[in-house]
Design a protein with these regions (language model features):
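Cytosolic regulatory regions of ion transport systems
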Residues: 1-171
Length: 171
């Protein structure tokens, strides 16, 4: 079985590396040849087939293995909402039982992805904002959360302490 990973930027690369470390196969589609070249130089423990193509085109997804019986899921991780939406729609229309996970940067795209039955929708900016808000509002809950998801655990004494006065968060 394998996952079809569309987009080999920072997120796609980290995900493919983690999948390979766990002996889970992946096929990568990215529109940029330099990213495909980087994948070939990454020295992964498993071979990872890659295709330099526009993942928003259903024919390219099909060529990469979307309808292959061993494809167990599609991960739309490009930097463009338009492309991720096209990947999710094509995946859901061609094989509705196939798991689809998509990255998004806007509420409008989130709503569109949800309307097509996307299994999981991740907005990295909203997720990070929620993470920061938890740290500010509930430092000990944040610490427990960090223990659960972070491989480099912090000590209990390292919970964030509230600084007096007003905060300015930029970004």
């Amino acid at each position: 079985p394998f996952y079809l990973v569309c987009g080999y930027g920072v997120t796609g690369r980290l995900l493919v590396h983690q999948l390979a470390k766990r002996d889970i196969r992946a096929v990568v589609v990215d529109i940029r040849q330099d990213r495909i070249d980087a994948l070939e130089l990454d020295n992964l423990p498993l071979p990872v087939p890659a295709l330099c193509a526009d993942a928003s085109l259903p024919d390219m997804l099909d060529h990469a293995g979307l309808q292959h019986p061993k494809c167990i899921g599609v991960l739309a991780l490009t930097n463009e909402d338009r492309v991720n939406l096209a990947i999710a729609i094509a995946s859901q229309l061609l094989l509705p039982e196939r798991q689809v996970i998509s990255r998004t940067n806007s509420d409008l795209t989130t709503a569109n992805l949800a309307s097509f039955g996307t299994d999981m929708i991740v907005d990295p900016f909203r997720a990070y904002a929620d993470y920061l808000a938890l740290a500010a509002r509930s430092p000990h809950k944040h610490l427990v959360y960090d223990w659960l998801i972070n491989p480099r655990h912090r000590h209990l004494a390292s919970a964030y302490k509230h600084a007096e006065g007003r905060w300015i968060i930029c970004g």
